Amino acid sequence: MVSNSQKDRAWSKAKRIPGKSPSKYRKDAYGNTLCYSSYGKNSPMGWEVDHIKPKSRGGSDSTMNLQALKTRVNRSKGADQRKRSRHSKSNR
């Protein structure tokens, strides 16, 4: 579960969009437009807090390890990491 503090820290790191209110709209690392009020939604501007280095691999909740990421992208990223871990050499 992500705290409000973590959510706000991740949001503050996302790129500002010129001409748009930074408290309402930002861009993630992939250039997707996010809407603050769409947090936790799987919608066109929905987003989640992503741990850049997953906690399962030793990542922390530090601000440096958090980012706002479009929901679809974050869930795809998680699926890719699970697939890689199932196929890694250490699991053979």
Which functions belong to the PLM regions below?
Residues 1, 57-60:
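Short N-terminal micro-motifs specific to bacterial/archaeal maturation
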Residues 2-47, 70:
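Short cysteine-rich loop/turn motifs with clustered Cys
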Residues 17-19, 56, 77-80:
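Substrate-binding/catalytic groove segments of enzymes
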Residues 31, 51, 58-59, 78:
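Glycine-centered flexibility sites
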Residues 41-42, 60-62:
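Extracellular/periplasmic catalytic domains that process cell-envelope and extracellular macromolecules
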Residues 45-57, 66-71:
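Histidine-centered catalytic micro-motifs used for acid/base chemistry in nuclease
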Residues 62-89:
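Short Cys/His-centered divalent metal-binding micro-motifs
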Residues 92:
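A binding-site-centric feature that preferentially detects glycan-recognition modules on secreted/surface proteins
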